[in-house]
C-alpha cells in the first residue's frame, strides 16, 4: 500500500541514520525537512555531501558498518503446514575492510604496501611499546582486539575480523622481536606453549602465572 509511510531513526552522537519506507520523493522531503530544522532551530548546517539518500539494497555506511537489506533465506510454515521460503527482506550489518584498516593505522600496527597493483596490509613494530614489560604488551594487544571484536561482533561477517587479528598478531610478534633484538621465529619458539602465545609473570604472592594472547575466535554474537 503506497499510502502507508514509515520511518525509523537511530542516532549516535552526531551520526544518524533514517530508514524510510516510501518513495524517493519522500526521502528528499525528509532530508529537506531535517536540513531546515537544523538550520532554523539549532543553527547548524547539514552537509549535502555527507547526507546521502541510498537505496536500502545498497550499502550505507554507519558507525563503521555497511548496512543494507537482502532477501531472507529463512524458511517458515504456511497456513497448511508446508515449508516455504520467506519473501521478506532482512537487515545486514557488514564490517568493511576500510574500518579495519583505519583501526590498524590508529594503533600504528600496520602499513600499506602495493604489490602487483594490489593493496597489501603489512604488520609493523609498535616501537612505542618496546619499553613495556611482556605482560603489559600482551594485555594491551588483547584489550584492543577484544574491544574491536566486542563492538563488531554483531556483524554478519564477524569472522572477517580474522584479517584484523592476523595483522595485530604479527605486529605483536615483531614488537617482541624488536624488544629483545631477536626474530619473529625465535620469539614464537620461546613464547608459544601448546600452540598459544603466553607470557609468564609473577603475582603479588610470587607465584608464576601465564597470560595468553587472545585466541578465542570471532564468532558472530
Q: Which stretches of residues belong to each language-model region?
A:
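Non-catalytic terminal/accessory segments
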Residues: 1-221
Amino acid at each position: 500500500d503506497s499510502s502507508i509511510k514509515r520511518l525509523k531513526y537511530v542516532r549516535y552522537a552526531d551520526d544518524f541514520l533514517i530508514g524510510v519506507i516510501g518513495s524517493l520523493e519522500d526521502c528528499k522531503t525528509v532530508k529537506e525537512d531535517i536540513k531546515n530544522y537544523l538550520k532554523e532551530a539549532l543553527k547548524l548546517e547539514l552537509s549535502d555531501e555527507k547526507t546521502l539518500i541510498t537505496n536500502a539494497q545498497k550499502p550505507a555506511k554507519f558507525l563503521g558498518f555497511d548496512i543494507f537489506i537482502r532477501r531472507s533465506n529463512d524458511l517458515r510454515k504456511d497456513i497448511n503446514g508446508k515449508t516455504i521460503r520467506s519473501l521478506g527482506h532482512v537487515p545486514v550489518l557488514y564490517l568493511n575492510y576500510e574500518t579495519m584498516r583505519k583501526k590498524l593505522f590508529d594503533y600504528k600496527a600496520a602499513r600499506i604496501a602495493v604489490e602487483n597493483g594490489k593493496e597489501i596490509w603489512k604488520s609493523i613494530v609498535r616501537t612505542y611499546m618496546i619499553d613495556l614489560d611482556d605482560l603489559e604488551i600482551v594485555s594491551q594487544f588483547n584489550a584492543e582486539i577484544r574491544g574491536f571484536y566486542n563492538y563488531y561482533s554483531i556483524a554478519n561477517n564477524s569472522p572477517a575480523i580474522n584479517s584484523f587479528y592476523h595483522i595485530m598478531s604479527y605486529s605483536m610478534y615483531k614488537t617482541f622481536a624488536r624488544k629483545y633484538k631477536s626474530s619473529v621465529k625465535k620469539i614464537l619458539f620461546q613464547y608459544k606453549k601448546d600452540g598459544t602465545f603466553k607470557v609468564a609473570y609473577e603475582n603479588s604472592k610470587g607465584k608464576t602465572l601465564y597470560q595468553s594472547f587472545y585466541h578465542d575466535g570471532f564468532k558472530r554474537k
